[in-house]
Structure formats: C-alpha cells, structure tokens
Swiss-Prot record:
The keyword Transferase applies. GO terms for biological process: 'de novo' pyrimidine nucleobase biosynthetic process; 'de novo' UMP biosynthetic process; amino acid metabolic process. L-aspartate binds at residues 84, 166, 227. This is Aspartate carbamoyltransferase catalytic subunit. The keyword Transferase applies. It comes from the Bacteria. Catalyzes the condensation of carbamoyl phosphate and aspartate to form carbamoyl aspartate and inorganic phosphate, the committed step in the de novo pyrimidine nucleotide biosynthesis pathway. One of its GO terms (cellular component) is cytosol. Heterododecamer (2C3:3R2) of six catalytic PyrB chains organized as two trimers (C3), and six regulatory PyrI chains organized as three dimers (R2).
Amino acid sequence: MPNPLYRQHIISISDLSREQLECLLQTALKLKAHPRGDLLEGKLIGSCFFEPSTRTRLSFETAVQRLGGKVIGFSDGANTSAKKGETLADTARIISGYTDAIVQRHPKDGAARVAAEFSRVPVINAGDGTNQHPSQTLLDLVTIYETQGRLDKLKIAMAGDLKYGRTVHSLCQALKRWGCEFAFVSPPSLAMPDYITEELEEADCRYRALGSLEEAAEWADILYMTRVQRERFDEQEFAKIQGKFNLEASMLARAKPNLRVLHPLPRTDEIHPDVDAAPHAYYFEQATNGVYARMAILSLVLNEEV
C-alpha cells in the first residue's frame, strides 16, 4: 500500500485525512510492538524549538536516535539569529538546506505553515502558539486506541482551559472523524472556541457542557484534563474558579471501569497526586507513547515504505 505521508508536511490535524491518521496510528502501534533502528539511517533532523519544551523536544529527539538518525538544532530561539531579526522564512530556507526534515515549535500561531512554505524539506509542527499540536494529537490517538480498543463512537470529556489549549483543539478535529461525542467542563471565559464546536456540528458530532468533573468522570470513556492558566485571570476572577476544575481520586468513584484520565502535561494542581494511584490514571503512559507517535511521523514522512 502506498505511503500517503511520504514527503508531506505535518502542520495541522485538519490537513490530514482519516486514512492518513489511521496510517500514522497503526505505524506507531507497530513500532511500539516491534521497534526498528534503521528507518532514519543516514538522515539528519533539524530540531528547532523557539520556545521551551520538555516532553515534545526530548521525545522527538529520542525518536530520531532510536530510528538511527541524528539531530541538530536549538532549544531556545533567543540563542539564534531570530534574536538579530532574521525572519522565520529565512531560517526555514537555511535549515532546510542542512537537514532532511525540520521539527519546529514556535510561539506564534501559523508559524509552522510559514516555515513549510519556504522549506525545501518536510516540516513537522511541534506546536505553534495556541493553534495546533498534531504530534500530541497522534500520541493521544495511540493512547485512546490502546486503552479503549477503538476510536469509533467514544465519549470524550475535556476539562480546564479549552479556549487556549491547542491540544484539545487538535484532538477534537481528529476524533470527529470517528463520530465521537464530546463533553466540555470549563469556566465560561475558557470555553471551547466557536470554530471547533462549529466543526463538530458539521461532522454531526454531539457535544454538551457539563458542570463538574464528577459528572464528566461518570459519563466519559476518556477524561482529558488541561491546566487552567492562572496568568490569564485577574486575582478576583481566578479565586472564583480556583479548585473547581481540579481532579481528585474521590471524584472518580462512579467512573466506568474503562475510563482513562489523560493530560498532555505538565500538570500543576489540576490533577491531585492521589489520582496517580487510581486505575483510571494513564497520563504517564500517554507521555511515553509520544516517542512511538513521533517515530511513526518521522518514519512515514521520510520513507516511501515503512
């Protein structure tokens, strides 16, 4: 079967078909079960992180090395010529002359698409502002499939910062292709953006607002937690919502046995440490799946056959 992702940019989940997502998912699962160390042999990957990252940067670099490739790059845009005023377009032109693919994280929405326009090699978006995070979405799909045995018709609850959280935007855009049903738990000021709910409506996916994490845990197959970002509130407004969207183990008392709690990490206080021992907690395993998801992306983008 032809590889539908060979030499393709990976910029946004909305650019990918269900066939392409399924190809990525199955390749990640295959590489997890049967690792290969030759798929990036002789390949050099540019790791271009203009803002801080722990899991995404290290898991991409781990993926490259486990596949037999090598990495060059930077972990802070302040130490590059961007500090001198070099445009992102010129940076992409230059680095694409050195490497076989570019993995880029940038604080500005749309930055990955700009880089792709000027790069001579595939660009993989490792997060652009509040916009998209497609490799996180793939590891989420791998984790959901691994824990539920399917993606079709699942009940997905999302909680916390749904307005600015790029992970939940991308995940909605992916899971709508499998007819999932959604529930949202957030303060009104951090509700899911209209453009996402409109896409769900166009895909005939039902969604609802729920008032508490207890309700969400009882209803859902997957409870996807995110951090409510204190810096986006004044002190008085934050005081009104503080603790309301923090998950504790006692809140999972009526959860279905198959419920899994996910989180893109890092967490602060939105998941209490007592949840870690609950059978529903799966966020650390989810983070581990980042390596296999990113191995799949790199392998498919840089090989005609995998």
